[in-house]
Amino acid sequence: MTFEMLYSKIHRATITDANLNYVGSITIDEDLAKLAKLREGMKVEIVDVNNGERFSTYVILGKKKGEICVNGAAARKVAIGDVVIILAYASMNEDEINAHKPSIVLVDEKNEILEK
């Protein structure tokens, strides 16, 4: 049996852009994404602290420092400056659960790393 468990999280990131006319996804500063163990194309859940919206999308690695940009139709669910939590989950069996520690990255309002 497997369980969906928290794999990693970027906590309280700030939306820097929302691009309605892009195909879809969330663009995340590559360094920040790698620290959170997020891979390009990985499914993530976005929770907007300001308005309560929750939605799923996939990761695109961005080149700009501190970039967190929601793309496509989901851009209507956020506003620039909103605070979000970016969550990734993984299916794990009992042994994997016991050995796993989620990667949690805390950032400030400029999406600079506070703590890992």
Curated annotation (Swiss-Prot):
The record's account of how the chain is modified after translation: Is synthesized initially as an inactive proenzyme, which is activated by self-cleavage at a specific serine bond to produce a beta-subunit with a hydroxyl group at its C-terminus and an alpha-subunit with a pyruvoyl group at its N-terminus.
Binding partners and assembly: Heterooctamer of four alpha and four beta subunits.
Catalytic reaction list: L-aspartate + H(+) = beta-alanine + CO2
Keywords for this protein: Autocatalytic cleavage, Cytoplasm, Decarboxylase, Lyase, Pantothenate biosynthesis, Pyruvate, Schiff base, Zymogen
Amino acids binding substrate: T57, G72, A73, A74
Keyword Cytoplasm among UniProt keywords: yes
NCBIfam families tied to this protein: panD (TIGR00223)
Family assignment from sequence similarity: Belongs to the PanD family.
Protein name per its UniProtKB record: Aspartate 1-decarboxylase
GO cellular component: cytosol
Record-level Gene Ontology MF annotations: aspartate 1-decarboxylase activity
Superkingdom, taxonomy of origin: Bacteria
Subcellular location per the Swiss-Prot or TrEMBL entry: Cytoplasm
Function as written in the Swiss-Prot or TrEMBL entry: Catalyzes the pyruvoyl-dependent decarboxylation of aspartate to produce beta-alanine.
Pyruvic acid (Ser) found at: S25
Cofactor needs: pyruvate
Cofactor: how bound: Binds 1 pyruvoyl group covalently per subunit.
Species in which this protein is naturally found: Helicobacter pylori (strain P12)
Active-site annotation: S25 (schiff-base intermediate with substrate), Y58 (proton donor)
Pathway: Cofactor biosynthesis; (R)-pantothenate biosynthesis; beta-alanine from L-aspartate: step 1/1
GO biological process: alanine biosynthetic process; pantothenate biosynthetic process
